[in-house]
């Protein structure tokens, strides 16, 4: 069941990588990376690997488009959400959902011992729940049809 799934379980399925961009990069450069990799957010990482924030499509829409700024001259550091809302590897899927909901974010960097080990997105959460529900449905179908039990031979 998805209530026992941890952030680390999601990363073990999807991988521990993440896409990062320096704070001095332009919003336009960030959008190109996001489009090339079909992602909705990038981690903003300072020289030395320190996580500075998260830059998302939402940040772009609210802080560039609505304010009439230029994506070619505005830096990611000016637009990123900071400090970043982060998860730990031991955090349950339910806790990740609550963190996302309460903070109105769709991407959680997962931190272990001060280092980013991956990102859990709202899409990852939804996919995990769907997988869990499919497994439950299969178990129930097998139980109902008897497919998970050996055939019984009547002896009289």
Task: Indicate where each model-derived feature is located.
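Tandem CBS (Cystathionine beta-synthase) repeat/Bateman regulatory domains
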Residues: 1-156
């Amino acid at each position: 069941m998805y209530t026992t799934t941890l952030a680390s379980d999601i990363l073990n399925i999807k991988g521990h990588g993440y896409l990062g961009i320096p704070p001095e990069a332009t919003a336009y450069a960030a959008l190109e990376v996001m489009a090339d990799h079909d992602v909705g957010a990038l981690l903003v990482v300072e020289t030395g690997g320190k996580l500075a924030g998260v830059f998302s499509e939402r940040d772009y829409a609210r802080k560039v488009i609505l304010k009439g700024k230029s994506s070619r001259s505005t830096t990611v550091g000016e637009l990123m959400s900071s400090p970043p809302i982060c998860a730990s590897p031991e955090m349950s899927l339910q806790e990740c959902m609550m963190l996302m909901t309460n903070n109105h974010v769709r991407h959680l960097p997962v931190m272990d011992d001060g280092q980013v080990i991956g990102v859990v997105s709202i899409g990852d959460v939804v996919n995990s729940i769907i997988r869990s529900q499919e497994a439950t449905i299969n178990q129930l179908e097998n139980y109902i049809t008897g497919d998970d039990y050996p055939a019984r031979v009547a002896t009289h």
